[in-house]
């Protein structure tokens, strides 16, 4: 009966604005489109209540931008942070975190599927939208009309070169380039076995033909949690409601 009433009343075109408001409210309640700050996105909750109590020693921040997330990690944990940012202008700002001494390493390079030089597409007025993928230009709000050539390495080769044997947490926010990061990180995922892996999931992945289920299947020994406002909830990656192409952060936790 309730479903019939809902269909009868809310399917009316005159109520479309109300429907959209309700839909957006529901999406935000589930952890989507909460991007204004780290508390709203659930990232501060994760660092404070989940990550920090495990006393992490080594953390990788892939797609660090100017270091807002790296800075919070440095403040809330005693870990050493390796931060990767390929866009030169953002890297120069990221380097300011060098005040943390040997606890912080900034790398002006990207992480991908191969060791090679790639074209980074960007908008100087919206540097957080920079991406190695041209597909993300199909996202209506992305206007990456400029480009630069930058160095890209695999996570596997970087860890081998630096003799890194332990990684407690990897955060990946690379504007739709996450599948390539995964392709170059098989040794890290299977041998180093980080406890936590966070990825940003967004509209970009629709145009990369990638779902959250795709990432989950690459991490068979991990449970999936979606960050919500000041919290997190365990999700089933096979559920369509977990694969909505709106901004959200998911954390994979090793069994």
Residue map of PLM features:
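Phosphate/nucleotide-binding beta-alpha loop and adjacent structural elements of enzyme active sites
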Residues: 1-255
């Amino acid at each position: 009966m309730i479903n019939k009433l809902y269909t009868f009343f809310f399917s009316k075109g005159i109520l479309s604005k109300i429907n959209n408001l309700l839909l957006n409210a529901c999406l935000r309640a589930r952890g989507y489109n909460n991007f204004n700050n780290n508390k709203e996105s659930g990232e501060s909750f994760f660092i404070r209540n989940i990550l920090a109590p495990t006393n992490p020693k080594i953390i990788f921040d892939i797609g660090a931008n100017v270091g807002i997330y790296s800075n919070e990690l440095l403040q809330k944990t005693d870990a050493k942070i390796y931060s990767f940012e390929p866009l030169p202008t953002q890297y120069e700002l990221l380097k300011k975190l060098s005040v943390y001494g040997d606890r912080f390493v900034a790398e002006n390079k990207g992480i991908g599927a191969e060791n090679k030089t790639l074209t980074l597409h960007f908008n100087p007025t919206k540097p957080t939208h920079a991406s190695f993928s041209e597909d993300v230009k199909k996202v209506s709000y992305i206007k990456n009309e400029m480009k630069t050539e930058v160095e890209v390495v695999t996570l596997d080769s970087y860890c081998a070169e630096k003799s890194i044997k332990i990684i407690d947490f990897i955060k990946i926010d690379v504007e739709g380039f996450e599948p390539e990061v995964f392709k170059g990180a098989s040794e890290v995922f299977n041998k180093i076995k980080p406890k936590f892996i966070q990825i940003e999931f967004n509209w970009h992945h629709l145009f990369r033909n990638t779902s959250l289920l795709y990432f989950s299947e690459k991490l068979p020994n991990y449970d999936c949690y979606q960050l919500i406002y000041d919290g997190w909830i365990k999700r089933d990656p096979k559920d369509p409601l977990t694969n909505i192409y709106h901004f959200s952060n998911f954390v994979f936790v090793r069994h």
